Regions:
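C-terminal beta-strand-loop-alpha-helix "lid" module of Rossmann-like NAD(P)-dependent dehydrogenases
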Residues: 1-285
């Protein structure tokens, strides 16, 4: 029984060490989540203005807009930018988005541009054609780091290698709730709106509405991907925080059970020793 007590003590120490790690990971994930969400929220107003500008151009009475980005195409092949994580220990974060992506791509001719190591590994193993992979996008992602993504998808679209473009990412709602979002980016659908008369009189586009529009679209797409990456990163950290919190709680419960086992074993040892002493004393009488 002494050997058993030693084993239990070693297990308690091991679980305590693990609990310290999971607690630290939980705190780190909380901090990273908050920073990513704040950056995403601060960026949205600028890209909302870009979108509004594109809508104004598309709504103008001049009807001069003939951008390649808005012309409808007969769908042949769709490109999917799918944002996953680079690491594990995040509960069902990656599994959820991959399942939704496969549902959307089912029965279609597609190509995949995965963001994140986990996304690349999953869709490569599933046999999806990978056009280009994007990994190791840092937590402190900057807008310049999504330019490569935008340049790639625009080239594919202009060269008619894809006829539609989608982004699939996870929107952070709360640490307990993350929603998989699927957005169609190209061709752009801009809901026309009625412009005020003064808007027609004051807005002039040089050299042309289409040229200005075509220069805004890449910036707008950069904003979409930038916010999507940040939302996904916040969602990943939220899922990881919950997973680590659960692991910490489970470790605490395990330690309680092990301590109970240890105390029972210790009590049994004491009882056994007392019994042996009493038996020895009786034998001497």
């Amino acid at each position: 029984m002494a050997t058993g007590m030693k084993d239990i003590k070693n297990r308690i120490t091991s679980v305590e060490n693990t609990m310290q790690i999971t607690k630290a990971m939980e705190l780190v994930a909380s901090s990273k989540l908050r920073k990513a969400k704040e950056k995403a929220e601060k960026s949205k107003p600028f890209f909302d203005i870009l979108y509004d500008t594109m809508v104004r151009i598309a709504s103008a009475k001049t009807k001069q807009l003939s951008s390649v980005y808005v012309k409808p195409r007969k769908e042949k092949k769709a490109g999917f930018v799918i944002i996953g994580g680079d690491k594990g220990l995040a509960g069902g974060y990656n599994t959820n988005i991959f399942r939704k992506a496969e549902e959307k791509m089912s029965g279609r001719e597609v190509c995949v541009l995965p963001i994140g190591k986990k996304a690349y590994e999953y869709f490569r193993k599933k046999g999806y054609p990978i056009v280009k992979r994007f990994e190791n996008i840092p937590e402190e992602v900057e807008k310049v780091q999504v330019v490569d993504i935008v340049d790639t998808v625009i080239e594919l679209y202009k060269n008619k290698e894809i006829d539609e473009l989608y982004v699939i990412y996870t929107e952070f709602v709360s640490a307990l709730t993350q929603i998989v979002r699927i957005k169609k980016l190209l061709p752009l659908y801009l809901k026309p709106r009625e412009l005020e008369e003064e808007e027609y009189e004051t807005v002039q586009y040089d050299p042309s509405p289409t040229a200005v529009f075509d220069n805004i679209v890449p910036l707008y797409l950069e904003g979409i991907f930038y916010v999507a990456v940040l939302e996904s990163y916040a969602s990943e950290q939220g899922a990881r925080r919950i997973a680590m919190e659960s692991a910490t709680d489970n470790a605490g419960e395990m330690i309680e059970q092990l301590n109970l086992q240890y105390n029972r074993a210790r009590q049994w040892n004491i009882t056994q020793e007392l019994s042996e002493i009493v038996s020895g004393a009786e034998a001497l009488k």
